[in-house]
């Protein structure tokens, strides 16, 4: 096929591929919104923060979300187009994810994939991999971060062949904007001098200079991460953080140490017992590693990861040695940041390794090109053929799964819309689900949204929320015991039960 030649792709060919990639992104976003039209929990927080921003309530904004830039964009976009904050967030996310797909192709080309075949392979990855599609129906800031992270990597790669100042400035600006979406962007911004040193020839740079940059970047990143850890609870301003950086890092280290010590104590008491208490640190370290591995493979998916490992095992690399060093450095930095998150929180949300996965995927077009060139189907043994077909079908299935996230929360939306006609005053609804409160128009009543059902029942028994006229509880479909417990605790049956074929159910109670 002419599309899959080794000839360099001209401007018209590249423009055609990028246009098809963008069109596919728009259609994919429309499809994902069609099959999942229920807002996500984070989306409620962003909308709540945007509403506080619109009223000039910065304290309420930061109470809703400590990283309000995306909410500010939703506010501006909504005002500009005259649409709701919900649709402003959805349109922004659709644009960001589509731009990420296009930028991914450009980054692969900047890393040496300039042929027609590699350009097509890059577009194929950007169109079908779940990392680009799985969260299109969500209102999240990660998509904005991913766009500007990829833009920074594009400028870094272009600095290799043309060390122009405009590319260096582009790296700084892109990382700075990425930092407005997620803390990782700020860490990469402070590490920019180190990353720029990686793309310089080792013959013109002293090892001690690179070591000095590493120490400085690590120190600045430690200050930023310490502020990120302490700011939500202590209300520390960024300027104040850098005015006393050593105290900030010391306080953060003390908090991390106390948190880890508590986790170790729990492991000793609940899992190991007195005769194996000395293995608590080993179990903790193993837990952190497994959290990292599980989150990374969950986002990258096993078949795609095996393709990358196969390529690395076969010696696949980028054409320029410096780009290999840059790629490895970016992956190492992502793993270091995720390790800090895992140690502090002992969990990683599924989308946290999103940028890491996209970085790893940069090698996939080159690995795919190598594998297809090396495989001789007629020479493969039966076992190898079966394995190849199995991995291919697995990879296709993983790709389809990113486009098959049909909502399981329609009962929540139905209940919220029904309650919207019955809970018109502030404090009239108590619920354990933010999405339900959003559709009922009561998401601004933060004190009336409690995720723990037991706390709601105890609060009702103690006379909390006296103005609430309705109680709406989302219960898992499998939690029959919890449902009977709720009915027994409230002393009566619900006035309405919202249920669908799949997903959770909602029990609505009317208070006397």
Predicted regions and their residues:
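Transmembrane-helix motifs of polytopic, lipid-linked glycan transferases
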Residues: 91-112, 151
């Amino acid at each position: 096929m002419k599309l899959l030649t080794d000839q360099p792709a001209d401007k018209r060919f590249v423009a055609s591929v990028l246009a098809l990639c963008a069109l596919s992104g728009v259609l994919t976003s429309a499809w994902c919104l069609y099959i999942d039209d229920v807002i996500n929990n984070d989306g409620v927080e962003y909308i709540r923060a945007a509403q506080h921003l619109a009223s000039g309530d910065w304290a309420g904004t930061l109470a809703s979300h400590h990283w309000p830039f995306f909410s500010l964009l939703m506010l501006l976009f909504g005002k500009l187009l005259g649409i709701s904050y919900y649709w402003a967030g959805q349109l922004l996310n659709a644009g960001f994810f589509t731009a990420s797909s296009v930028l991914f192709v450009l980054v692969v080309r900047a890393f040496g994939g300039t042929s027609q075949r590699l350009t097509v392979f890059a577009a194929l990855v950007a169109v079908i991999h779940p990392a680009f599609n799985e969260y299109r129906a969500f209102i999240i800031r990660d998509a904005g971060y991913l766009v500007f992270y990829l833009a920074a990597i594009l400028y870094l790669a272009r600095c290799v062949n043309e060390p122009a100042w405009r590319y260096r400035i582009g790296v700084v600006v892109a990382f700075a904007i990425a930092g407005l979406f997620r803390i990782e962007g700020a860490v990469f911004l402070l590490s920019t001098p180190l990353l720029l040193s990686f793309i310089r020839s080792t013959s013109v740079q002293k090892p001690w200079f690179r070591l000095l940059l590493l120490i400085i970047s690590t120190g600045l990143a430690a200050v930023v991460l310490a502020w990120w850890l302490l700011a939500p609870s202590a209300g520390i301003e960024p300027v104040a953080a850098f005015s006393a950086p050593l105290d900030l890092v010391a306080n953060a280290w003390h908090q991390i140490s106390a948190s880890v010590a508590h986790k170790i104590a729990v492991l000793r008491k609940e899992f190991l017992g007195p005769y194996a208490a000395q293995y608590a640190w080993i179990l903790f370290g193993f837990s952190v590693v497994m959290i990292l591995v599980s989150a990374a493979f969950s986002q990258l998916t096993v078949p795609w990861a095996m393709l990358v490992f196969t390529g690395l095992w076969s010696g696949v690399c980028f054409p320029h040695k410096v780009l290999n060093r840059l790629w490895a450095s970016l992956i190492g930095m992502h793993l270091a940041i995720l390790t800090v998150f895992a140690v502090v929180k002992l969990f990683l949300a599924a989308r946290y390794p999103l940028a890491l996965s996209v970085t790893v995927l940069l090698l996939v077009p080159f690995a795919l090109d190598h594998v297809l060139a090396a495989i001789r189907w007629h020479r493969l043994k039966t076992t190898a053929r079966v394995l190849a077909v199995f991995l291919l079908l697995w990879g296709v299935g993983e790709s389809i799964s990113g486009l098959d996230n049909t909502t399981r929360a329609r009962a929540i939306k139905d209940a919220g819309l029904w309650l919207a006609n019955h809970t018109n005053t502030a404090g009239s609804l108590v619920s354990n689900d933010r999405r339900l409160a959003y559709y009922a128009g009561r998401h601004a009543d933060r004190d009336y949204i409690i995720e723990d059902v037991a706390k709601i029942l105890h609060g009702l028994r103690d006379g909390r929320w006296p103005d609430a006229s309705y109680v709406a509880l989302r219960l898992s479909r499998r939690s029959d015991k919890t449902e009977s417990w709720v009915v027994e605790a409230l002393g009566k049956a619900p006035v309405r039960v919202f249920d669908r074929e799949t997903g959770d159910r909602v029990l609505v109670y009317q208070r006397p």
